A protein has these predicted regions:
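Divalent metal-binding pocket/active-site signature
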Residues: 1-61
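Glycine-enriched alpha-helix->loop->beta-strand junction motifs that scaffold or abut catalytic
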Residues: 19-22, 43-50, 67-74, 95-99
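Active-site beta-loop-alpha junctions enriched in small/polar residues
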Residues: 28-30, 58-61, 76-80, 105-109
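Short acidic/histidine-rich active-site segments
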Residues: 30, 97-113, 133
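Short acidic active-site motifs
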Residues: 61-62, 87
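A short, acidic, amphipathic alpha-helical segment used as a generic capping/interface helix at domain edges
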Residues: 84-93
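Mid-to-C-terminal alpha-helical segments outside catalytic/metal-binding sites
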Residues: 117-182
Length: 182
């Protein structure tokens, strides 16, 4: 972490601490071990509650460092780079699901926003239960972000009714198909 990155990381963590808000920290692309160690040190120097921090873009080398903290453990699943579904499953098998969060992206590089459900499928194929998959892919991130007070866990856990008979401005996307109503 450069001195500038260090200063601005501390400033952003301080804002989160002052307002008691959760914060997501992206580990550096280079020197991931050193950067993760320094990130943890800055978190402690600022004094933000570790349970309000998720450290993201973890891998096999950096996850053990974060396990010694109360921070949440974020993993970005990408095609060809960073973390794959299979590597994520191996980490879950080794370290368990507590505070583990899986995400994906649709960003500037090669990415696949469907990597989260694909990771869920890989977890099921590896013998994880549906409840364990739901814990990692849904409940853990909801529990983390609900700490903000801006996310109602009950509301997001209640399935929305589906009625494809409803239209928007007299228009339907069904194109002649039978509507689903649940």
């Amino acid at each position: 972490i450069t001195p500038e990155e260090d200063r601005f990381l501390a400033a952003q963590l301080e804002l989160a601490r002052q307002f008691n808000l959760p914060v997501l920290v992206h580990t550096p692309h280079r020197d991931k071990i050193g950067g993760t160690k320094r990130t943890l040190a800055v978190i402690r120097e600022v004094g933000i509650a570790e349970n309000l921090v998720i450290i993201d873009h973890l891998n096999e080398l950096t996850l053990p460092l974060v396990l010694d903290s109360d921070c949440w453990r974020g993993h970005s699943i990408y095609p060809n780079t960073k973390m794959s579904e299979q590597r994520m499953v191996a980490l879950l098998q080794e370290y368990g699901s507590e505070k583990m969060v899986v995400n994906s992206a649709a960003d500037w590089g090669i990415s696949d926003p469907l990597k989260v459900p694909k990771t869920g499928q890989a977890m099921l194929a590896a013998g994880f239960s549906e409840a364990q998959v739901e814990q990692v892919l849904f409940h853990n991130p909801v529990d983390f972000f609900a700490q903000s007070g801006q996310l109602d866990k009950q509301l997001v856990s209640t399935p929305l009714p589906i009625d494809q008979r409803r239209q928007w401005q007299d228009n339907s996307a069904l194109r002649g198909q039978e509507p689903v109503v649940k």
